[in-house]
Regions:
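Short pre-active-site segment immediately N-terminal to the catalytic Zn-binding motif
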Residues: 72-80
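Non-catalytic accessory/assembly modules
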Residues: 153-157, 173-180, 387, 407, ...
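M16/insulysin-pitrilysin zinc metalloprotease superfamily fold
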Residues: 93-97, 128-159, 238, 333-391
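Bacterial N-terminal signal peptides
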Residues: 13-28
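Non-catalytic, conformational "gating/processing" segments within enzyme and secreted inhibitor domains
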Residues: 152, 159, 180, 212-244, ...
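Active-site SXXK
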Residues: 81-95
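Non-catalytic beta-strand/loop surface segments
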Residues: 32-73, 99-132, 169-222, 247-294, ...
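N-terminal secretory signal peptides that target proteins for export/translocation
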Residues: 1-12
Length: 453
């Protein structure tokens, strides 16, 4: 599975939409289930360098186990795009003890679910399983960390699978094609400009040796972070981890990441893509945002929540409620090197793309001049803080929240302090950050159009 910029943004929207339900569910829990021990992180590090974070949640005898490798598509060398995601696929092939294709079947026979994901910054593998089956799953995960068999007859056919995935998820999706075009411009000269799934011509040239080299270079305990959420404590997990993961030797000298800095655009870029599958035109504007953990992150998040975060946002009130747009949104997304800020709108029938762009930017410019009202600021901070309740109420979401930030170099203390930083955001903070990132000409405009008949 690949985590594109578009997919990540949609996931943010789904989380916010579901948080009210999650809050109600949490409030309804009996006091015995809402103990202070739930979700309080505990950490330890093994002698071979593997770092572990435990997020206890004792409401049910299940655990979510996520192993994160601090390597993603941004670490690929020129001409080898898609290699990180390709190896993700191959990690489900054979080891010395597990036949090819049996890994997920064994997880399923034990009542669990498993999956994996590749981003620019990391690759992660997870399973959700009953607590008493955890040791077996950990042994399987440790086995493929060091004993993966990359036979030619297994590797080469998988390239066809990955290429077909690109056809289905990107080349058959006009929005995904335009999303790749935007990334190529906003991140020009940086590895983020290259699609995570890779370019089709470069995928065709990947080899078994490429996969083996990638595996041996990056897949070691010293480059891994283990996040386990669920009915377990560090006192229970640590002996298991020491016995199972502790037996995995270090790979040796780990390559240092060599990413060039993300450079702001010298001038704005206008993109468009037309396709017969598009039924309604849409417009978006994307700016460079902040890196994961940047000091401006929380204020920018609050500002974008006010501008385009939902049915009480300024864009929604001024565009949707006035019949000018059928959809509008705004969000800030952090990534390790540097994230993005974007607004978008789909014009209502009879409204042109040029008109909706002008109106959306008029709303944005007014917000940049005036700043938030006290009511808007308070409501946005409450909405964002409430999303943490949704995150904590779901083992997978919680493990993802920690894993994404830990692989970007944040500490547990920094992650835990996020809610306090949101609450501390002032109107002046919002004004300062919004006027820092949403001004000037360093943006990409993108228009998705129905193909002319």
């Amino acid at each position: 599975m690949i985590l594109t910029r578009l997919a990540a943004a949609l996931r943010v929207k789904r989380c916010i939409a579901a948080m009210v339900t999650a809050m109600a569910a949490l409030i309804a829990l009996p006091a015995s289930a809402q103990t202070e021990d739930n979700w309080k992180p505990e950490t330890f590090t093994l002698a071979n360098g593997l770092t572990a974070v435990v997020l206890p949640d004792h409401r049910a005898p299940v655990v979510t186990h996520m192993l994160w490798y601090r390597v993603g598509s941004a670490d690929e060398v020129k001409g080898k795009s898609g290699l990180a995601h390709f190896l993700e696929h191959l990690m489900f092939k054979a080891t010395d003890d597990i036949p090819a294709g049996e890994f997920s079947k064994i997880v399923a026979r034990n009542g669990g679910q498993d999956n994996a994901a590749t981003s620019y910054d990391y690759t992660t593998y997870h399973f959700r399983i009953a607590k008493d089956r955890l040791p077996q799953m950990m042994r399987m995960e440790a086995d493929r960390m060091v004993h993966l068999k990359l036979d030619e007859q297994e590797v080469i056919p998988e390239l066809s699978v990955v290429r077909e995935e690109r056809r289905q998820t990107v080349e058959s999706s006009p929005a995904a094609i335009l999303d790749e075009m935007v990334s190529a411009q906003i991140y020009a000269g940086h590895p983020y400009a290259i699609p995570i799934i890779g370019h089709m011509d470069e995928l065709a040239k990947l080899t078994r040796d490429d996969a083996v080299d990638w595996y041996r270079t990056w897949y070691g305990p010293e480059n891994a972070i283990l996040v386990v959420a669920g009915d377990i404590t560090a006192a229970e997990l640590k002996p298991l981890a020491e016995n199972i993961y502790g037996a995995v030797p270090r790979r040796g000298d780990l390559k240092a990441r060599k990413w060039p800095p993300v450079q702001a655009l010298a001038k704005s870029v206008e993109l468009s893509h037309a396709d017969p599958k598009v039924s309604q035109a849409s417009w978006s504007r994307t700016w460079l945002g902040v890196a994961m953990g940047d000091g401006d992150a929380e204020a920018l998040q609050v500002g974008m929540e006010i501008l385009g975060g939902g049915r009480v946002s300024r864009l929604y009130r001024e565009l949707n409620e006035q019949g000018r747009a059928t959809m509008s949104s705004g969000y800030s997304m952090e990534m390790e090197a540097r994230g993005i800020v974007a607004i978008s709108a789909t014009p209502a029938p009879g409204v042109s793309v040029a008109a909706i762009e002008a109106e959306a930017m008029a709303v944005t410019s007014k917000f940049l001049r005036e700043g938030p009202t006290a009511q808007e600021l308070s409501r946005a901070k409450k909405m964002i803080a409430a999303s943490a309740v949704f995150t904590r109420d779901n083992q997978m979401s919680l493990a993802e929240w920690y894993g994404e930030r830990l692989t970007a170099g944040q500490t547990v203390a920094q992650i835990e302090g996020w809610e306090d930083r949101i609450r501390a955001v002032t109107a002046a903070d919002v004004m300062r950050t919004m006027n820092r990132y949403l001004v000037g000409t360093n943006y990409v405009d993108a228009v998705l159009l129905p193909e002319a008949k």
